[in-house]
């Protein structure tokens, strides 16, 4: 069995159980609700900082994915952002996949897709 594939399956299983880490009292203020991100609780009486039962979970090293597959696409490829054909040609098709930048227009996108097919490079957003 391939080690990378095994670790990707483990990462997928871990991600299903991982909670959304939101800041303390995110539900209370509209400015927090519309901008969901983690901020460490720092209040002296904060139950969340003290890790009390029933309060929201905090990020810690135990929630991270296996080191070998951290940051990889679920398909197992390393993502590389591509703006033109020249950047596409620098990609290693065995371990990297291209993601076409959102600023690329339709004409250049077609050129990139055609060249990717020739080179055998996987495009994540064709």
Curated annotation (Swiss-Prot):
This protein's UniProt keywords: Ribonucleoprotein, Ribosomal protein
Gene Ontology BP annotations: translation
Top-level taxon: Archaea
Ribonucleoprotein in keyword set: yes
PANTHER family reported for this sequence: 60S RIBOSOMAL PROTEIN L32 AND DNA-DIRECTED RNA POLYMERASE II, SUBUNIT N (PTHR23413), RIBOSOMAL PROTEIN L32 (PTHR23413:SF1)
Homology family: Belongs to the eukaryotic ribosomal protein eL32 family.
HAMAP family noted in UniProt: Ribosomal_eL32
Listed name of the protein: Large ribosomal subunit protein eL32
The organism of origin for this protein: Thermococcus onnurineus (strain NA1)
Gene, per the UniProt record: rpl32e
